[in-house]
């Protein structure tokens, strides 16, 4: 199963055509077509009818495309029936609280892939943890299916469950995000998210701080609800040129040192040992993966001209 680099995910209500039609221009690594919270109950059926054609529209700019479904048992099968078609990269399961929910989701998706000629295991899962109950089960959930590629905290709903309002520094979800990182990293699942609110889309400075706090905890990307937030996420999760240059030199001098019999070398007054060397390799790998994503998006946009 190929897992591409994904820094930013732009969430769009699929029932608003003008948002979907412009999605490919927004620069996001992924577009998430929403059937859940952003779509009112009276619009659910109409939204489902729009998903199939919206997959191709949203993908025009080279982004991955997913659908956030409703967890409600009365709606989940209908949402999947409307969503699992060629061109779908992923399904986001909101308010997850058990491994069994993921396994049930997998059974339905497997069946639809077979029926619709989609290569097995094409559709990956993103898991949204939005309750303390879900957080307690996060470790089991993270290993419930090999399709799970990412997991993240939904800050607004999680705060609602805690009975608190989101704060400027996100202190009330600091532990939850840290725990998601802890359970995800050992099993190869990408931890995503914010330490702060997703809703303040006009205050980009505060949003950048929320993204940066999550990155510092070990998250690998974030979601957003407004196009202006996309560039912020991409910038925060892209290593700077200076950092990449230092990483490249660190790898070179360390490997030269090893050849000379030492595993600790000096680079511009900084020690480069095995952890620093390994971290430098991760930075270079991330930069290479981001370059591949940007190339894919640029080539897709060029074909539209």
Regions found by a protein language model. Name each.
Residues 1-305:
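Expand to "…catalyze enediolate/carbanion chemistry for C-C bond making/breaking, isomerization
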